[in-house]
Amino acid sequence: MNNKQNYFGILILVIAMIAFAGCEKDADPVPNATQKLSIHLHTNVGNTEADYVTTFSDGSGRKFTLSDCRYYLSNLVLIKSDGSELPLTDIVLLVNPADQDYELTDVPVGDYKGIKMLFGLDSVTNHTDPAIYPAGDPLAIQTPGIHWDWNSGYIFLKMEGLCDTTIAGNGVADYPFFYHVGMDALKRTIDLSNQPFSVVSGTDKELFVEVDVLEVLANVNLRTENETHTFNNMPLATKIADNFPASIVME
């Protein structure tokens, strides 16, 4: 009798252990730890922070000032250590010199090879109506405006100011210039996938990025190439769009 009791006792114990193990396997997995990711972005003119009061010099020494310098960055993608991609969906940055801190989203803790993004907007976003976005959204109606109502699209880069147009290039910055660069064909991929960083548990991560206006204006002659609405001077708009990826670096 005792042997039978022992046998049934052991059998019940084994069944209980199997059931417990099954419950453990069915338990919800522990979610991966995440931390907040943000970008600290400087818009510089060479080694000087861009602003709307300073007189700057371009690569040839020609003087210019800025009264507007805003641009869109979007479609951010993190490159994981194994080469796979982590898109940061629904994030659009409207960058201007006065605002340097841009909060992105929570991302998994781990090692990353770098980041990719677009200068400008993808075609779907580019052709949405800014009136549908709430005030404060980067895609909402802005003042001054950064959307072409007549062209149904956003201005990816809006740079305006005054420049010296003397032949010798030794005068004062008093002639208006404007570069309004947009249209689907002029979005450009920015590849910073060779800039590794790590997101550590318990510490929010901030990426330090710099855009150099002098690189955006590389090989642009302010005296003779001082205006484009894109459609009316596509070669100049294309030159500026082509320059943009090389203007942005991670510090």
Q: How would you describe each model-predicted region?
A:
Residues N2-I10:
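Bacterial N-terminal signal peptides that target proteins for export
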Residues E24-E251:
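A short, solvent-exposed, low-complexity linear motif enriched for acidic/polar residues
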Residues I18-G22:
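C-terminal motif of bacterial Sec signal peptides marking the signal peptidase cleavage site
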Residues I12-I15:
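N-terminal, intrinsically disordered, basic low-complexity segments enriched in Arg/Pro/Ser/Thr
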